[in-house]
Amino acid sequence: MPNQHTMASSNLLPVGSNISTWWNFGSMLLTCLALQTLTGFFLAIHYTANINLAFSSVTHIVRDVPYGWIMQNMHAIGASMFFICIYTHIARGLYYGLYLNKEVWLSGTALLIVLMATAFFGYVLPWGQMSFWAATVITNLLTAIPYMGPKLTTWFWGGFSINDPTLTRFFALHFILPFLIISLSSIHIMLLHNEGSNNPLGTNPDIDKIPFHPYHSYKDMFIITTMIATLFIIMSFMPNLFNDPENFSKANPLVTPQHIKPEWYFLFAYGILRSIPNKLGGTMALLMSVLILTTMPFTHTSHIRSLTFRPITQVVFWTFIATFITITWTATKPVEPPFILISQMASSMYFLFFIIHPLLGWVENKIMMINH
């Protein structure tokens, strides 16, 4: 289209006119990343990576450092915001068939794995009860690896149990991984702009494009302002909304919490891990809960890209979202009936989505052929 070339030559970045609010989460994630990097840097200045001093150094940041409470709360709540945005971003990708842009989808999945690792290392740093025991449970999964598992665990811990060397390396990893996230994000954005974003209809947007600025840039700014306002409201009035009460006590290896659980954004994976009564099987399921996303570009069978015009698959998609929430809820409960059965059923349904999705695409193709 002539106007598209004119826009491109004027550096106006032509974008499809019909992209909805679901397309704003990329810029929200970029804002979250900037906030996390900035607040993380100021927290790292005052933090001490030592098992005897870590807990008191976090207390010192909150109580004595000027505006330290803002930095600490913004970093902790910002992590939750980050995951709310990223899960919505992924759900949008699944719904609108954006995974067919393979390079973008696979780089995004790699980004998610690095992000989850970074968040896990960060959760251990305050050295509270839940930090210590969550680290013990998750790192212990390495022992499930046949033959080399125990040696690998000892090497990772830097000793025969979680101790000072473990905290030091977790801090080093938590500091370095965000730079990898920034690099991968740049690659992710470059790959996206190589082909251009899709739209809710799943059609070729070249026929109707408008300049990114001012139309979409103002929309981005509005949603970012809303997100930051929400962040400040939670930080001011409900700062401990996402915190675990156990983490207000210093780590004690001799006292086990009644119910060990990670942060809410890992509960879906933790629920899947717990639903399998076998260490290696559970570890494999835990890894697959995230890695299975990489199969989506290769198992798409429908002639239609987006779910906008696929009502049968829409039902399956929303069942998948409900399943995700159910697993998250059951993971907060103790391992006892009826939660064991609910967790196992929900975990089975979670993986079943990735099998049913391509089959339904094939069925829908057949229905359309009959109608034609």
Swiss-Prot record:
A ubiquinone binds at residue 193. Component of the ubiquinol-cytochrome c reductase complex (complex III or cytochrome b-c1 complex) that is part of the mitochondrial respiratory chain. The b-c1 complex mediates electron transfer from ubiquinol to cytochrome c. Contributes to the generation of a proton gradient across the mitochondrial membrane that is then used for ATP synthesis. Binds 2 heme b groups non-covalently. It is found in: Mitochondrion inner membrane. Heme b b566 binds at residues 89, 188. Gene3D superfamilies: Cytochrome Bc1 Complex, Chain C (1.20.810.10). It is a multi-pass membrane protein. This is Cytochrome b. The cytochrome bc1 complex contains 3 respiratory subunits (MT-CYB, CYC1 and UQCRFS1), 2 core proteins (UQCRC1 and UQCRC2) and probably 6 low-molecular weight proteins. Belongs to the cytochrome b family. One of its GO terms (molecular function) is metal ion binding. Heme b b562 binds at residues 75, 174. One of its GO terms (cellular component) is respiratory chain complex III. Pfam families: Cytochrom_B_C, Cytochrome_B. It comes from the Eukaryota. Keywords: Electron transport, Heme, Iron, Membrane, Metal-binding, Mitochondrion, Mitochondrion inner membrane, Respiratory chain, Transmembrane, Transmembrane helix, Transport, Ubiquinone. It comes from Pseudechis australis. Its cofactor is heme b. InterPro entries: Cyt_b/b6_C (IPR005798), Cyt_b/b6_C_sf (IPR036150), Cyt_b/b6_N (IPR005797), Cytb/b6-like_sf (IPR027387), Cytochrome_b (IPR030689), Cytochrome_b_C_euk/bac (IPR048260), Cytochrome_b_N_euk/bac (IPR048259), Di-haem_cyt_TM (IPR016174). The chain crosses the membrane at residues 25-45, 69-90, 105-125, 170-190, 218-238, 280-300, 312-332, 339-358. Its main location: mitochondrion. PANTHER family: CYTOCHROME B. One of its GO terms (biological process) is mitochondrial electron transport, ubiquinol to cytochrome c. Heme 1 (or BL or b562) is low-potential and absorbs at about 562 nm, and heme 2 (or BH or b566) is high-potential and absorbs at about 566 nm.
